[in-house]
Amino acid sequence: MAAAAVDSAMEVVPALAEEAAPEVAGLSCLVNLPGEVLEYILCCGSLTAADIGRVSSTCRRLRELCQSSGKVWKEQFRVRWPSLMKHYSPTDYVNWLEEYKVRQKAGLEARKIVASFSKRFFSEHVPCNGFSDIENLEGPEIFFEDELVCILNMEGRKALTWKYYAKKILYYLRQQKILNNLKAFLQQPDDYESYLEGAVYIDQYCNPLSDISLKDIQAQIDSIVELVCKTLRGINSRHPSLAFKAGESSMIVEIELQSQVLDAMNYVLYDQLKFQGNRMDYYNALNLYMHQVLIRRTGIPISMSLLYLTIARQLGVPLEPVNFPSHFLLRWCQGAEGATLDIFDYIYIDAFGKGKQLTVKECEYLIGQHVTAALYGVVNVKKVLQRMVGNLLSLGKREGIDQSYQLLRDSLDLYLAMYPDQVQLLLLQARLYFHLGIWPEKVLDILQHIQTLDPGQHGAVGYLVQHTLEHIERKKEEVGVEVKLRSDEKHRDVCYSIGLIMKHKRYGYNCVIYGWDPTCMMGHEWIRNMNVHSLPHGHHQPFYNVLVEDGSCRYAAQENLEYNVEPQEISHPDVGRYFSEFTGTHYIPNAELEIRYPEDLEFVYETVQNIYSAKKENIDE
């Protein structure tokens, strides 16, 4: 069935006839127009690919104008998929008709896979091997990514399940590509000092759905460099940095000339552009992402230092990164070239503190403690990235218990890409996956690796192995889908249905119901910890699985819920897993959820009619 759909869709682009049909009466006026005019008409944007295919079959002249590598099919491709044009060079020879067909086929294949995910993975997190279908597809990866982006950009509140799985697939594909790029980057020799490139890989990995590129970030930095040069020209119109061409630089030797650059930088960054250290919201991951530092013009010491360092080096000032405890710094050499230097031959720059220049003693005052000379030394790219990822790791551990721990998962991936044998972090990763109930097979692989690296971890490893194997066995024992019918006598007390927008009477949060039980199905410990016995109806009442607007999933007693008289969308990341559409008053379950609650939708319609229609009538009166 799916294959037939693909074949049918491919017929949208008719094959060009080997022999053009004889000229048809009425075409003579058209074909006698100058070629440029005909080409303009065919590229006007009103004609579809099918139209072009049919036009090209009418006569030899039109067929030649619609040749595969010409402007007509290029325009068809551009109009249909404009975001892909940046991947083509104006000098490249491209068979645009063939490119159109390949892109169309890739899109159909991508949609077929996205459509299959809900049925395959509704009851569990998408496993590690769940993305193998996408990885094994033939054709350019950018075409599949582009189709996924098209799905995510579909307008309106429909296709929520498609968007949910398209987002997961795109997230995975981009992260895999970025991680491979980062690993290749880390194999560069030690003298390869592109700190910005490494920082951008970290930014991209943690934000794979954002359009972040080194080229764009470098362009923004280049624009800052231009402003610095403008200021520098007012200080010293003959300054050698002004002669540097874009993308080229060399180091300036004279300290006075270097000082002029730093003065101009400080004026532009902190006075003109108003960059500043983020003291008010220091523990925010956005402070570590370079694209956000440039947008928000704020960051923490390490991200501000990397920006400052990049600009200074482009203008010929050889600053170096210093992995100073609690406060990342840059150092600026004041000694003669080739001389034996110690820590007192440097000035230390605090990019977080508006480019303030510090002595060794002032650095100690900055953090309130004495440190050894070794901590004033320069560090390589890998150590800088290690500190950035370490900061993200610390922030990830702060995430609330109801969150997906995505930042912690991403930062663990990045850290272990740099240091794959860190036993404690491997153990943390295994525990995290175990806690989230995802990827049990991967958990076993991690635990086996830990046991090989450090047999002394046998106790912790053994505990996790045992419980992970039990989890796998329970999954194997799971029978078919449990169907809950509202008409069943044991469900007579259930008042609400999946898809309804509710409000918690006590805590005031908004939520949507995605499941229910006739009585509380949690264990005794949970019931005791949540003080369920203090409720008037205790645990002998229906309980509802709800997605809450703060991103959490909760289990709420019926007596604590009420209809939300002002229903609104619930901005929960898992809404698309259960629902296909938001109507403005309620959510419509997707096919998989409806199988489990086949009678709920009819009840939802009745409830919406009674609650919201009555409200509208009262307002009209």
Curated annotation (Swiss-Prot):
SUPFAM superfamilies xref list: F-box domain, YccV-like
Gene3D superfamilies to which the protein is assigned, alphabetical: 1.20.1280.50, Hemimethylated DNA-binding domain
Top-level taxonomic group: Eukaryota
Keywords, comma-separated and alphabetical: Ubl conjugation pathway
Annotated ranges, domain F-box: 28-77
SMART domains: YccV-like (SM00992)
Oxidoreductase in keyword set: no
A GO term, aspect molecular function: DNA binding
InterPro entries: F-box-like_dom_sf, F-box_dom, Hemimethylated_DNA-bd_dom, Hemimethylated_DNA-bd_sf, SirB1_N
Subunit structure as annotated in this protein's UniProt entry: Interacts with SKP1 and CUL1.
Purpose of the protein: Substrate-recognition component of the SCF (SKP1-CUL1-F-box protein)-type E3 ubiquitin ligase complex.
Protein name listed in UniProt: F-box only protein 21
Organism of origin: Pongo abelii
